[in-house]
Each structure stands twice: as C-alpha cells, then as structure tokens.
Swiss-Prot record:
NCBIfam families membership: dat, PRK06938.1
Record protein name field: Diaminobutyrate--2-oxoglutarate aminotransferase
Molecular-function GO term, any one: pyridoxal phosphate binding
The species this protein was found in: Rhizobium meliloti (strain 1021)
Keywords for this protein: Aminotransferase, Plasmid, Pyridoxal phosphate, Transferase
UniProt keyword Transferase, yes or no: yes
Pfam families on file: Aminotran_3 (PF00202)
Gene designation: rhbA
Length: 470
C-alpha cells in the first residue's frame, strides 16, 4: 500500500473531525437533535436506541458519550463476525491499496470470481452443481424482487404465494409479500396476485389447535388450496418462505412442514424461493436455515452477512430457471468489490473457526438461560428460535387468554423490557405481532461470558417488572 494511502486509511480524521478526540465531539443529544431535524420521519432505530455511535469492536459498540453497549442486534443480523473484525478490515485495506476497481457493474474480477466460488461452496450438493448467481443492488429487498422476476419469467405465470408473518423487504414487490399490514397501510395498490397462507406458528396457532398439529394442518391446507380447481388461486409463479421467520417473531418452521411445502411445489412445478437474508450464513446453527429439513430450494435469496458487513445481495438459483434475456435484471452497485472481498474473508473465517457449529452451541446456552428466566416469570409465553436467532414472546398475564389458553400479546411490556435492557447496556430488537417478541441476533462470535451478561440483564429486567406489578 502506498505510504500516503496507508496514512489516510489509518487516520481517524474525517471531514476535518477527529473521530477519536473527545474534545472534538458533541454529545448524544447534539447528534440526535440534528438527526431528528434533518432525517426522514421513517427512521426507526434511533427512536428506541437514542445514541450516536463512535466506535465498535466485536459485540460491543460505544457512543460519543463513552458508554458501551453489548449489541444483540448486530445490524439486524448482518454482522456475523461482529463489528470491525481485524481480518476483514485488513482485507478491505488490501483491496483499497491494490488498484482494483471498486465499481465494476457486472464485469468480472479475481475478487468476484473467488467470491462466487466461495459462496457456491456453501451450497448443498443438489444445488451447487447446477447453480447460477445474479448479483443485485445491495439490499435484500432487491434480491427478492429479482427472484420474483426470475420465477415469473421462467414460468410465464404471475401469481405469488407468501405466508402470514412474512417479511421480504420494503420495495413494491417485496412489500406485496409482507404479512405485516402496517408498512402497507398508506402505500395503496401493490403488486397484484399475492396470496397468503398460514405459517406454522404453533404458539398462536392459526387453526386454534397448537402443538405439532399446527404444522400438519398448515401443510394440508397449503396442499389442498393449491390443488383445488375451485380454490380461486391460479397456479403461482413461485412460493416464497423463510425457514425461520425473523421480523415476524422468530418463528422456526418445523421440518415436516418445510418438507411438505417442498414436495407440493415440486409436484406442481412451482419454483420454491427461500429467503435466507437474515437466517443464512450460519446464524441458525446450519449455514442455511432450510438445511435442517434436508430440502433443496429452487431459488435462494442472500444478503446481510454475505457481504461481511458491507452491502451485497445475490440470488442463487437452478440453471434451468435462467431464462432471462441479457439485462433483464441489473443494479448499478451490483459490482461492489469491497463487499465481495469482505464476504470471502468472512466465509473463510466462519469455516476456519467453525462458527456455524459455534452458533449452535452458543444458541443452546443462550436459549437455556432464556428458558430459565421464562420459568420464573409470568411475562414470557414462549422462548423459540434456532442457533443465535432467538425470540422471547412477551405476554400480558392479566389479559384474557386466547383459545389455546395463552395470555395476549404484551407489546407494552416488551417495550418496557427493551428500554430496561438498553439502560443496562444491552441492545436488542422487538418484532412479531404487535412488537411483542424480544429478538436476539448477536454476532456469531459472542462469548459465553457475554451470553451470560445478556441473560443476567434480562433476568433482572423481568424481576424488576414483577416487583413493580406486585
């Protein structure tokens, strides 16, 4: 690396401000006030986490006031290796000093070629040998849009099937496939032809039965509706699902349901799209969440962690679906070389340090801790999830129970717990119906001590809540 470039990249000076000099900094309130005055009303996280961040390393972020937080949001699951992993930073510095063009559209480079080989190496055998990849604009929602276009082009059909509670992004087509009504309410007409089926959410069973029956009934309903000539649903261009619903409340799909959906879609010639934007890259204790069921999707959507913390999104699919004409899908920033380099380095570290297995082990520890907390408080209805993608459904024990005897959603209680956790130096998100699920998405490198720190803070928050209610 040239000396002048090395000096610039190692400097903490940005636009004339020394980012590390306390005397040059204003406080959180200063930056939050400026953000409120200048940024869109659509901003969300600063309303729950009122901080201006200065630095980050591993699982820890530090604000401009010098207070540190253990980050169990991690860029909504983007930061598999945590913040600023030294090997990823070194890789980025090497690329910046190499003279490699950073913006290549869909022209190839050695960095891109390696990334494609690396990501294909993570695929199950039934897809790896016949896979094609499309680089998209660098967000998961654009990759979902690309997958929709791919399926419509390949099948000549237009209808789409999604599931209640689904989240696939915020652009027009993706929003049409979202279960949550809130973001759609003021948008008006979305893409027509989207049909929603029950997802196997056993705790709030859509059939009023619960337990293992939920998956069986959901699978039977799905198959009968798609095979019914009087069912009112045209054979769709694709079925899209999450093997673990994330924003929908951290709801893992049972393997028998996933297998049934795969069998039906294969029998009917319907491409199956699995959205692994949040659940992929080892988070659930498998590299892909769908692998627990032993199924092979036709299309896999990836973003978030696949770019090593930088913006990148891809669609991987069976080559027989590749009926696009040249230029049928594009995106100016689909050639993000820094993200591809960071992605390759991230995949290398995940494999070398066995972080997929670590996610499974760490997830079991965290889940066991959460279940112990749940056993001691009436405010937790269920602990669920896989690996380091876990959710705690908060309930209101004073409310009227549902048909299954479960207390109603405790959205206000969940917000209180989230606030208490933030005060204790833990960042975690809420989601699910009415925002009543505490969601934990820490980096895969979280230590046992950090897991116990999170668990201890959560136990203390619920204990304080119980004392106030007594």
């Amino acid at each position: 690396m040239p000396a002048d470039l090395a000096a610039r990249t190692s400097s903490k000076i940005f636009n004339g401000v020394d980012l590390m000099d306390a005397s040059a900094r204003a406080d959180n309130a200063f930056y939050l006030d400026r953000q409120e005055r200048r940024e869109s009303n659509a901003r969300s996280y600063p309303r729950r986490f009122p901080v201006a961040l200065k630095s980050a390393s591993g699982c820890i972020v530090t604000d401009v006031d010098g207070r540190s937080y253990l980050d169990c949001l991690a860029g909504a699951g983007t930061l598999a290796l945590g913040h600023n992993h030294p090997e990823v930073i070194e890789t980025l510095q090497q690329v910046l000093g190499s003279g490699l063009p950073l913006h290549t559209l869909d022209l190839t480079t050695p960095v891109k070629d390696r990334f494609v080989s690396d990501i294909f190496g993570t695929l199950p055998a039934g897809l790896r040998d016949e896979a094609k990849i499309q680089f998209c604009s660098p967000s998961g929602t654009d990759a979902v849009e690309a997958a929709i276009k791919l399926a419509k082009t390949a099948t000549g059909r237009t209808d789409l099937v999604s599931f209640r509670g689904a989240y696939h992004g915020m652009s027009q087509g993706s929003l049409s496939l979202m279960g949550s009504l809130g973001p759609k309410a003021s948008v008006g007409q979305l893409v027509p032809g989207a049909h929603f089926f029950p997802y196997p959410y056993a705790y709030r069973c859509p059939f009023g039965r619960g337990g293992n029956e939920t998956a069986t009934l959901a699978a039977e309903y799905f198959e009968r509706a798609l095979r019914d000539p009087e069912g009112g649903i045209n054979r769709p261009a694709a079925v899209i699902l999450e093997a673990v619903q994330g924003e929908g409340g951290v709801i893992p799909a049972p393997v028998e349901w996933l297998r049934a959906v795969r069998r039906v879609t294969r029998d009917l010639g319907i491409p199956l799209i699995v959205d692994e934007v949040q659940s992929g890259v080892g988070r659930t204790g498998s590299f892909y969440a769908f692998q627990k069921a032993g199924i092979i999707p036709d299309v896999v959507v990836l973003s978030k962690a696949i770019g090593g913390g930088l913006p990148l999104a891809v669609v991987i699919y069976r080559e027989d679906l590749d009926l696009w004409k040249p230029g049928a899908h594009a995106g100016t920033f689909r050639g993000n070389q820094l993200a591809m380099a960071a992605g390759s380095k991230t995949l290398e570290i995940i494999e070398r340090e066995r972080l997929v297995e670590r996610a499974a082990i760490a997830g079991r520890r965290l889940r066991a801790n959460l279940e112990r907390i749940a056993a001691q408080t009436p405010y937790i209805g269920e602990v669920r999830g896989e690996g380091l993608m876990l959710g705690v459904e908060v309930v209101d024990p004073e409310g009227l129970p549902d048909a299954l005897g479960h207390p109603p959603h405790g959205q206000e209680i969940a917000r209180m717990i989230q606030h208490e956790m933030f005060r204790a130096g833990i960042i975690l998100e809420t989601g699910g119906r009415f925002g009543s699920v505490l969601r934990l998405l820490p980096p895969l490198v979280i230590s046992d001590a950090e897991i116990d720190q999170v668990s201890g803070a959560l136990a203390a928050a619920f204990e304080r809540l119980g004392r106030k209610a007594a």
